[in-house]
A protein has these predicted regions:
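Short helix-initiation/N-cap motifs at beta->coil->alpha
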Residues: 63-64, 79-90, 133, 151, ...
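Extracytoplasmic small-molecule ligand-binding "clamshell" domains
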Residues: 30-103
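Bacterial signal peptide processing site
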Residues: 19-22
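Ligand-binding cleft/hinge of the Venus flytrap
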Residues: 50-54, 66-75, 142, 151-171, ...
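C-terminal motif of bacterial Sec signal peptides marking the signal peptidase cleavage site
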Residues: 14-17
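Acidic, polar ligand-binding/catalytic clefts
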Residues: 76-140
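Short loop->beta-strand "edge-of-pocket" segments that line small-molecule binding or catalytic clefts
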Residues: 38-42, 138-150
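Positively charged n-region of N-terminal signal peptides that target proteins for export
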Residues: 1-4, 9
Length: 188
């Protein structure tokens, strides 16, 4: 059972991230210098999935999973930290072989990448300052400033709801802007 679970998790990473249908990406992957090293794209700023611990070591659920997969497959790992909006561009350009970061499935990504069954489930929440009275639901964000990454599902949700988007590199930056009152909220 443990081996089956590990194989399923491996498929999540390999199919979801490496399964790009473009021939350019296949060429980039096949020209990788070290076939025993898996180049991993990740944010490194999205706890508890991918972040730095007190010793500044990259850790988190997604990092632990990809390490377990690599151990099982006798692969070395090379982690490449990048912003969310650069994640798929790095994969497409061949800078990464796989993404180990929370990735939501959407129609555009399904057209370009292959996905296995999801291994985590989450839903969007609206994050506002504790004393915020004017924003209590998703429908209240029309015309409000929300800090979002442009290419995330949450960024698309904010656009769909009519929010004024302030571009950020990740969730930590969203929270900094929210706490400093430079934005009204963020979806996450």
């Amino acid at each position: 059972m443990k081996r089956l679970l590990l194989c399923i998790v491996a498929l999540v990473f390999v199919l979801a991230a490496c399964g790009n249908n473009s021939s350019n990406n296949k060429d980039n992957q096949s020209s990788s210098k070290d076939k025993d090293t898996l180049r991993v794209g990740t944010e490194g700023t999205y706890a508890p999935f991918t972040y730095h611990n007190k010793k500044d070591q990259l850790t988190g659920y997604d990092i632990d999973v990809i390490k377990a997969v690599a151990k099982e497959e006798n692969l070395k790992l090379k982690f490449n930290e990048t912003s969310w909006d650069s994640m798929f561009a790095g994969l497409d350009a061949g800078r990464f072989d796989v993404i180990a970061n929370q990735v939501g499935v959407n129609k555009d990504r399904e057209k370009k990448y292959k996905f296995s069954e999801p291994y985590t489930y989450s839903s969007a929440v609206l994050v506002v300052r504790e004393n915020e009275k004017g924003i209590t639901s998703f429908n209240d964000v029309k015309g409000k400033k929300l800090a979002q990454t442009f290419t995330s599902n949450y960024g698309q949700l904010a656009k769909d709801k009519g929010a004024d988007i302030t571009k950020v590199d990740g969730f930590n930056q969203s929270m900094d802007l929210l706490l400093s009152k430079r934005v009204d909220g963020t979806f996450n």
